[in-house]
Design a protein with these regions (language model features):
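Short sequence/structural segments immediately N-terminal
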Residues: 1-125
Length: 125
């Protein structure tokens, strides 16, 4: 989402900070734990960050699943998608996702960041 063919650039807060006031404040409080990790050496080197990448990603995926991928939906909305303009496989997947009540993060993990080492994750995560 940072570099793409359309030139529209999503920055960190677009995906990681809710727009509504109360959810935004809750997210900022939770982010203090991440700041603590950086300051006190838990994730202060690339190696330590990589060692914690899966846990951090799973926490973020859970947050996005719990809020129905709201930050994605600020820009992307099933209701306004023209699936006829999409590649056939994407259209089928989006139509099925709507029927199954899925949210963006169910299929689009790794859309903006490289995925962590997924060997410890059970298939179909």
């Amino acid at each position: 989402h940072y570099n793409n063919r359309s030139g529209v650039r999503a920055t960190c807060p677009d995906c990681h900070v809710p727009h509504e006031f109360v959810p935004k404040m809750i997210r900022k409080l939770k982010a203090s734990k991440e700041l603590y990790g950086k300051i006190f050496g838990v994730i202060d080197t690339p190696q330590k960050f990589e060692a914690h990448r899966l846990t951090m990603a799973q926490n973020e995926w859970r947050r996005m699943k719990d809020n129905n991928s709201q930050e994605c939906r600020n820009c992307h909305n099933f209701e306004y998608m023209d699936t006829t303009a999409q590649k056939s496989v994407a259209a089928k997947m989006h139509d099925q996702a709507v029927k199954d009540g899925q949210t963006c993060i169910d299929c689009h993990k790794g859309i903006a960041h490289k995925l962590p080492d997924m060997r410890e994750v059970e298939p179909g995560f």
